[in-house]
Amino acid sequence: MSSESKSSQSEKELSGLVLEQKIKGSRKVSNYLVASMLSIGGVGFLLASFSSYFGRDFLPLGNPSTLIFVPQGLVMGLYGLAAFLLAIYFWRLINIDYGSGVNRFDKNKGVLSLSRRGLFKNIEIEIPIDEIKAVKLEVREGFNPLRRVSLRIKGRKDLPISRVGSPKPLLDLENEGAEIARFLEVNLEGI
């Protein structure tokens, strides 16, 4: 047997003992759109404010130089500054891919490792697999729907492990929960 086939065989054996799930973060189309709109709107309001202060048109549309600086130009400048600062925050979240990470269930080591990208540092949690009692599916409909997979852990609160954001379809949620429960050989609750 060649070394190449031995390595692929050992990878297959390891894949049966390790389950790894990638979690998407804040790099979503909706976040890019919001950050872009805030940037464009913030710059537009700031330019309108500067136009009213200096008496020159810095914007190609309209005639903002005719605005009275106090109070209209000043308020537009404050709105522009607030939008621009919020846009910087959104671009920072997108840049670091806030919330992304990995769920790694490793039967070799007997450990569940969760890692997520935080705003200022990465968050890493390790829990022994034998402390996991069940996989729980949480579904709440209504104005603020909730659909997530969480783990029931001995002596602790439930630990959510699915991504935050728009609700997943129920079939995907059930399949994800069933895959984890089958791998860990624990019960699946909440169906």
From Swiss-Prot:
Origin: domain of life: Bacteria
Listed GO CC annotations: photosystem I; plasma membrane-derived thylakoid membrane
Subcellular location: Cellular thylakoid membrane
Subcellular location, principal: membrane
Any one Gene Ontology BP term: photosynthesis
Keyword annotations from UniProtKB, A to Z: Membrane, Photosynthesis, Thylakoid, Transmembrane, Transmembrane helix
Position of the signal peptide: none
Keyword Phosphoprotein: no
Pfam families given in the database record: Ycf4
Membrane topology: Multi-pass membrane protein
Function: Seems to be required for the assembly of the photosystem I complex.
Family (UniProt): Belongs to the Ycf4 family.
Protein name, as recorded: Photosystem I assembly protein Ycf4
Species annotation: Prochlorococcus marinus (strain NATL1A)
